[in-house]
Amino acid sequence: MIPEDRLQQILQRYQYLEAAMADGAGGDIAKLAKEYSDLRPVVEQISAYQQLLSDLAEAEEMLADPDMKALAEEEIPTLKAALPQAEHALQLALLPKDEADSRAAILEIRPGTGGDEAALFAADLYRMYSRYAETQGWKVDVIEEQASELGGLKELVARINGDGVFARLKYESGVHRVQRVPVTESGGRIHTSAATVAVLPEAEDVDIKIDANDLRIDTMRASGAGGQHVNTTDSAVRITHLPTGLVVTSSEKSQHRNREIAMQVLKTRLYDLERQRIDTERSADRASQVGSGDRSERIRTYNFPQGRMSDHRINLTLYKLDQIMGGDLDEIIDALISEHQAKLLAEMGQ
């Protein structure tokens, strides 16, 4: 049973926010509006749950009325059967939220072990995420891309913007392993390669303040696949954050735009480091994550000869690899979210 006093606190806060926005009082209206918007689905679940309890209590009272008893006996089993689902939906709505879930994300993909084949797999992963983003109505902007000679990727950094981007893609961080016969393999032997994926919530200006004295900014010529020069101006920008050693590059044609993009990616990486530090300190939070959260953790295997994808964190195996590589990721992501929610619910019940 969910404590009634907790539900009343949420409803009172919601009513306060509604009144504060109506009369323009209470501080930062934009901040109040966001909190109000975040609480709305919770309040809707509370209302549905409380209405069900009220209907059940009313039906049970009707049992004492001879004229209404038959109707009550018909309604009560239906209402009782609906109660567990309503309570579960409310519990999910009450789970602690990751404040970064609503943010855009920075996607980073880099080949691991496997040479040319790993670079080709990195390119396959980028296509997979790009196609998934397209199905979700998200916008993908490439920030940095280094192609290999065979058409793979030595590095890919992209910004993905849209509704719920980080909330759905954050479970993709980790080592992705592929088992297949490489195009360069004449003997038909299956090789194992890997690529590392990192999904970072985009930082906002209020998250990270950077001292200009902590930066070294270099300009250089932008280059494409194979090292050829894309243009003749020194437009590419490389920013080094001296305290951490983080290095960010951006190589669009506008040097001013490159500096803006590189600074945004740097802030995002610093923000991610801070989030990791806080997560490490919260041992209970670490226990509730799907997997260890370590980006060196092998999270998934893509076996092409068998047409199989296995996610090792939740023991999920699907035999529809072509669809998955084509961007059909909802079944995997939904399963990961459900597992994460189940662990949080278990912690709430302790």
Curated annotation (Swiss-Prot):
InterPro entries linked to this entry: PCRF, Pep_chain_release_fac_I, Pep_chain_release_fac_I_sf, Prokaryotic/Mito_RF, RF-1
UniProt signal peptide: none
Compartments, as annotated in UniProt: Cytoplasm
UniProt record similarity statement: Belongs to the prokaryotic/mitochondrial release factor family.
Main location, first listed in the record: cytoplasm
Keywords: Cytoplasm, Methylation, Protein biosynthesis
Gene source species: Ruegeria sp. (strain TM1040) (Silicibacter sp.)
Record note on modification: Methylated by PrmC. Methylation increases the termination efficiency of RF1.
Keyword flag Protein biosynthesis: yes
GO-annotated molecular function: translation release factor activity, codon specific
Region of interest: Disordered: 280-304
Cysteine-cysteine disulfides: none
Function per UniProt: Peptide chain release factor 1 directs the termination of translation in response to the peptide chain termination codons UAG and UAA.
Record-listed N5-methylglutamine modification sites: 228
Stated name of the protein: Peptide chain release factor 1
Cellular component, GO, one term: cytoplasm
